Curated annotation (Swiss-Prot):
Disulfide bonds: C9-C78
Keywords noted in UniProt: Disulfide bond, Membrane, Mitochondrion, Mitochondrion inner membrane, Protein transport, Translocation, Transmembrane, Transmembrane helix, Transport
Record's subunit section: Component of the TIM23 complex at least composed of TIMM23, TIMM17 (TIMM17A or TIMM17B) and TIMM50. The complex interacts with the TIMM44 component of the PAM complex and with DNAJC15.
Name of the gene encoding the protein in the UniProt record: TIMM17A
Name of the protein described by the UniProt record: Mitochondrial import inner membrane translocase subunit Tim17-A
First-listed, main subcellular location of the protein, grouped into a coarse class: mitochondrion
Pfam families named among the record's database cross-references: Tim17
Signal peptide positions on this chain: none
Biased composition (Low complexity): 151-163
Key word Metal-binding present: no
Bilayer topology term: Multi-pass membrane protein
Lineage: Eukaryota, Metazoa, Chordata, Craniata, Vertebrata
Compartments (UniProt record): Mitochondrion inner membrane
Amino acid sequence: MEEYAREPCPWRIVDDCGGAFTMGTIGGGIFQAIKGFRNSPVGVNHRLRGSLTAIKTRAPQLGGSFAVWGGLFSMIDCSMVQVRGKEDPWNSITSGALTGAILAARNGPVAMVGSAAMGGILLALIEGAGILLTRFASAQFPNGPQFAEDPSQLPSTQLPSSPFGDYRQYQ
């Protein structure tokens, strides 16, 4: 599955890091808004204030964590593309596993193995879903009849004579 809209590798890292930061900040903001609202004292003003405080406190931290994950994943993915010389789903699966292992390195080897397995499985599921979606979408639009590129291969049909002589304008 090739992605034609992706940036070249050095800029892909920055692009993915920024996208992950945005996704983490927005998603974390929504989650923290709900969490802050539920954990605040009774009263609309208290709940709204608690919700806003939770958003301001935790959403940027979650965005930063997502950005670290996205940047590290993209760096490993670009390195895999450079080393292997091809861009396929195995690069993403391996990058997800290595990213999970590296980010869990401070917690010991058992946590590294668990995070590597989760990262690899998660990325394998994402890549598999992308491949299935592409196959399903391409089956919706079957190829039409193939046209010959060389006009001499076409069967000769006799056109009616033209009132303008033997000149065939629309052949």
